[in-house]
Amino acid sequence: MENISFGKEQLAKGIYGGTLPPTRKLAQIAVADIGAVAIRVLEEAGRFTGKRYDLAGDELTGNDVTAILSRVTGRPFTYYQIPLDVIRQRMGEDGAKMYEWFDRVGFMVDRPALRREFPDVAFHDFESWAKTLDWKALLQSGGSK
């Protein structure tokens, strides 16, 4: 979820940019949730040896994110789909292939199963996570460049 701060300049203008079509869902996770899972795995290493988990606290479209940003900040946001050519220039061919795969196949997580496996981790949904941020400072810092 913290990846949203990479677009501070655009957010300051009321634009949320993403690489997927505005109605394509993508799983997202907060850094705090990754840390909480890592602690649990380290504390109970024997139980988790050889296991692999996809992590997500929420699954949202670009339109979902803009609606949440508008509610949380009290400012209107619009979605802008970043062209793959721009992604390719900024992130290289591997980055472009990753987003092509997200669009073609999707990245979704069995969140109910994840919560059963890690019941003590309070996975954040995007809106509750967004409410913890200082949007005034974040949006001002993005507009100052």
Model-derived segments and spans:
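Oxidoreductase cofactor-interface core, primarily capturing Rossmann-like NAD(P)-dependent enzymes
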Residues: 1-78, 86-91, 134
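Conserved residues in the N-terminal Rossmann fold of short-chain dehydrogenase/reductase
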Residues: 81
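A hydrophobic C-terminal alpha-helical subdomain
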Residues: 84-145
